[in-house]
């Protein structure tokens, strides 16, 4: 009897220390996607607006760190940790972030292709994207038109934001695909990260920031700051940055991760 209990305890410990199978992770994300698709438009809007506002803290924190550090080659290694803060707030706070939904809600659609489900995914994407961008714009406008921060910090806002606008359309699109890929992989890793969830978010968001990969929400806080301060035109804000970063993030999140993961586990099941 004692031997059996010891064996059961040992098996339990082995299971606790073993990474969950990929199909279990897939099913967890799939069910989360189903839950998101059942949410009302009003709830998605409010959560998406909160997420857009929260992402503004990525620019603020990175700028505050940069303003208090010397201009040295190693400075971004520290300041880009600030870029992670917006993602930490949004994801741990379970707010609706557009790039997160490119993975979760697309899995149910890929498994059961129906017009009604496609329209529901389109509804969720549109509502969350618009709410995120509205929140990002409000935050950026407040930074540009209030005295929340002194002139020195606002100058850093401009420097960081102008750097994100420097690449051409194609470069922003391709880099955006890499950003979408990484954020979707973050979502894939989170369900069973348990106590390591915070570090998963920080490390991946830090990599996105350090590599200067454009994120359609975090990056558009910077974009909208320049627009609100009169540094760029409306055409530049939308045509040069918003459009390519959006396309790139969707390609990375859907084509490179969601479709690949779906194919891997559905083919295995068949």
Give the ranges of each region predicted by the language model:
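Alpha-helical transmembrane segments and their helix-helix packing motifs
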Residues: 2-270
């Amino acid at each position: 009897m004692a031997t059996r209990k010891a064996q059961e305890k040992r098996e339990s410990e082995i299971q606790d220390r073993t990474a969950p199978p990929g199909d279990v992770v897939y099913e967890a994300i799939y069910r989360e996607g189903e839950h998101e698709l059942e949410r009302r438009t009003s709830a998605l809007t409010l959560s998406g607006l909160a997420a857009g506002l929260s992402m503004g803290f990525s620019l603020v924190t990175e700028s505050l760190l940069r303003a208090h550090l010397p201009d040295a080659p190693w400075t971004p290694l520290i300041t880009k940790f600030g870029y992670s803060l917006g993602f930490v707030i949004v994801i741990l706070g379970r707010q609706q972030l557009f790039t997160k939904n490119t993975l979760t809600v697309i899995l149910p659609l890929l498994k059961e292709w129906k017009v009604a489900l496609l329209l529901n995914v389109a509804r969720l994407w549109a509502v969350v994207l618009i709410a995120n961008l509205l929140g990002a714009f409000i935050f950026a406008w407040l930074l540009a038109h209030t005295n929340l921060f002194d002139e020195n910090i606002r100058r850093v806002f401009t420097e960081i934001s102008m750097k994100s606008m420097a690449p051409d359309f194609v470069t922003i699109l391709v880099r955006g695909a890499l950003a979408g890929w990484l954020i979707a992989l973050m979502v894939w890793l989170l369900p069973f990260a348990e106590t390591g969830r915070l570090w998963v978010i920080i490390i991946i968001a830090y990599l996105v920031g350090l590599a200067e990969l454009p994120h359609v929400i975090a990056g558009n806080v910077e974009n909208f700051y320049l627009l609100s301060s009169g540094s760029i035109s409306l055409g530049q804000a939308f045509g040069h940055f918003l459009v390519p970063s959006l396309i790139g993030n969707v390609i990375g999140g859907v084509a490179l991760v969601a479709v690949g993961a779906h194919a891997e586990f559905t083919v295995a099941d068949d």
